[in-house]
Amino acid sequence: MLRPIRGSRGRSVTTAIDPHSLLMLAQSRHPADRERLLEDMVDYCGQAELDELNAPAMREMIGSLFMTLVAEAERDIRRRLAEKIAPAPWAPQALINVLALDDIEIAAPVISASPVLQDHDLIRLLVESTLDHQIAIARRGRLSSPVIEAILKQEEPAVLTALAGNDTADISRSAMEKLVDHSRRVAAMRSPLARHPRLSSDMAQRLYLWVGQSLRTALVGRFRLDP
């Protein structure tokens, strides 16, 4: 028996679904069928109970459906899907990795918020994705040390600047020292580094040597440096 709920646009969305019937519809050659099903699944996942979504059979069914549908889904539908499932711990790993490599407008919410993305996924993305994707990774909250080290090795100025502005990243002292060193040639890094909570007084003293007057004043005020 199907139990309907109302979708975000007033459409009926089922919360008990026959996997065989849905997979048949997902394999339909009619674009309208595939589009309708993906929209219903997006609405469903946005409203279903977490325990229901975490059930093994449901996780397998959702993963198969999304991977079948997303390959031919239009851009705006993929974007809606990414926004809906970005923070979801139940999201299929394969789907999240596919969306993370999509156009940046689609990938950004997934890169920023998905708890499904692991360090090795993010490091792989740094190698395989565009500069915009790499910047989004550097801005991700609570970025781990292995990912930070991968960013530092690439030495991409725009990505380093994004990392310098990430106050929640787990930046070690040695990584912070490397960022300060990079700021000598990358001027855009200087202002966020001067405000960074992990900047120490000895690092500030080095940073002071190549920043402008306004940042020098800020550093002196913050660390009581001897100009």
Regions found by a protein language model. Give the residues of each.
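Alpha-helical scaffold segments
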Residues: L2-P227
